[in-house]
Design a protein with these regions (language model features):
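Extreme N-terminal starter segment of soluble prokaryotic enzymes
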Residues: 2-9
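Glycosyltransferases and closely related glycan-assembly transferases
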Residues: 97-110, 119-135
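Short, well-ordered alpha-helical microsegments
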Residues: 19, 48, 118-120, 143-145
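A short, glycine/small-residue-rich beta-strand->loop->alpha-helix junction that serves as a flexible
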Residues: 13-22
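Conserved N-terminal ligand/cofactor-binding loop architecture of enzyme catalytic domains
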Residues: 25-105
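Active-site-proximal region of nucleotide-activated glycan assembly enzymes
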Residues: 127-160
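Short hydrophobic segments within beta-strands
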Residues: 9-13, 41, 137
Length: 160
């Protein structure tokens, strides 16, 4: 007899509503099965609260006041190189900060609906739990370089 329900951890980021809404839609679908426990986590909760709030405010300000700056950063990030070093640094720190939450949830599978949670869990998987099943649901219009992470077992991409 199973000692626990199959646990799905949905991880999203509050950057754009699509990432969160995709996770909520998946949660609603999984919850129809009584044998599945579903937890929806926000990776910004891994930050100290003041940092998460500040980052989100700055991000939203850039989108509204300086969209050209966002476009420039997006293109830089999609080139690889130095941006991948930054991705690894950020995701490594967040994997460390979020490890208590992840251990507490003890998921059988993690589904990331944003590139940052995919990267965080890729590092967590490499460091702590290599057998963890990690999936990415690409919620962007294109597959950004930061989405491509070692350790992601499956990517899901909408076609229409």
């Amino acid at each position: 007899m199973k000692t626990h329900k199959f646990t799905v951890l949905l991880l999203s980021a509050p950057i754009g509503s699509g990432h969160r809404l995709a996770a909520e839609a998946l949660k609603e679908t999984f919850e129809k099965n009584k044998d599945i426990k579903v937890v929806h986590g926000n990776v910004f909760d891994f930050f100290p609260a003041i940092l998460g709030k500040t980052f989100l405010k700055v991000y939203l300000w850039i989108l509204g006041a300086c969209p050209w700056l966002y476009e420039m950063m997006y293109k830089w990030g999609n080139r690889g190189g130095g941006s991948l070093w930054m991705r690894e640094f950020i995701n490594g720190a967040l994997a460390y900060l979020g490890s208590g939450f992840i251990k507490k949830v003890n998921p059988d599978v993690v589904i990331a609906t944003h590139a940052t949670p995919a990267g965080i869990m890729s590092i967590y998987k490499r460091r702590k739990q290599s057998s963890l099943c990690l999936c990415g649901v690409v919620t962007d219009y294109t597959v950004h370089t930061w989405w491509i992470c070692d350790g992601v077992d499956t990517y899901f991409i909408a076609d229409e």
